[in-house]
A protein has these predicted regions:
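Residues immediately within or flanking Cys/His clusters that coordinate Zn2+
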Residues: 4-6, 24
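Short cysteine-rich clusters marking metal-coordination/redox-active sites
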Residues: 9-12, 27-30
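Long, acidic/polar, low-complexity amphipathic helices and coiled-coil-like
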Residues: 17, 23-25, 62-63, 67
Length: 250
């Protein structure tokens, strides 16, 4: 962890703390969002999702998750000890885009092989975690965009952590394009065996900077520590470790 640094909020004058590498920061006193390098106002939409669960309710969600499914040990909910419940508002860029790919390739699953052409057209609200080192299963997180509101620091719980962005808008859009192209290439390879040529065109409709409430839960079971991620906006389990004796991670 680097040394915490500060700039002054140009709106209220309060100190805004940030870590080295963070490029967008939000004042915890007035909710003003600034670009760290310049101290200037952040000009893009800054939204948030509301957390709907307190620590006691989160524990109930965790116990319910432990009881579900045949992969988990039958005594997990009864014997597991929840050791940590941390609410973190993670920063994301949500890139809304239409993507259309045209491809041509060789289909070798029949004899003789034939040349096939096809198209893939999809719409996405593509999620880019705005942190470089934080591990989070973004592809498994169904962000409930219908619940987003303008960022309001008064809605953030006193015990919660709010992480700032380490990735700017242009980098996020570039990553989204790259990842969508990779997904479309994968989908094309379900239809053909060798790609001869492929072209993807994208139309971006909006890019939103969003803070989402994620509960990072740790629990102990038979002497080992496991982690579960809970969506604070919906109560859904995003991803959780299952103790050995089950069959892995879901």
């Amino acid at each position: 962890m680097g040394v915490v640094q500060e700039i002054r909020c140009s709106h209220c004058g309060a100190p805004i703390s940030f870590q080295p590498g963070e490029i967008i920061a939000t004042c915890k006193y007035c909710g003003y969002t600034v670009v760290v390098e310049t101290g200037q106002t952040f000009t893009f939409e800054h939204s948030m999702l509301l957390n709907k669960y307190d620590p006691t309710q989160v524990e109930e969600l965790v116990r319910d998750w432990m009881r579900e499914g045949f992969l988990k040990p039958p005594d997990l909910a009864r014997k597991a000890k929840i050791t940590e419940k941390t609410l973190i508002y993670l920063p994301f860029w949500v890139v809304s885009a239409k993507a259309e790919s045209s491809y041509k390739g060789i289909f070798e699953r029949i004899t003789p092989a034939i040349v096939k052409e096809g198209k893939i057209a999809k719409e996405y609200d593509w999620l880019i975690l705005a942190r470089k080192a934080t591990e989070f299963p973004a592809r498994e997180y169904e962000v409930p965009l219908e619940g987003k509101i303008p960022f309001d620091f008064r809605k953030v719980e006193a015990f919660a952590k709010v992480l700032n962005s380490e990735i700017d808008k242009n980098d996020a859009v570039g990553l989204a394009k790259q990842q969508i192209e990779e997904i479309h290439r994968y989908l094309a390879q379900q239809d053909i065996d060798k790609i001869i040529e492929m072209k993807t065109e994208m139309e971006m409709s909006q890019v939103v900077y969003l803070h989402a409430p994620i509960w990072f839960v740790k629990y102990e079971y038979k002497g080992k520590i496991y982690q579960l991620l809970i969506d604070g906006a919906t109560g859904a389990a995003i991803k959780g470790d299952i103790p050995s004796g089950g069959f892995g991670i879901i």
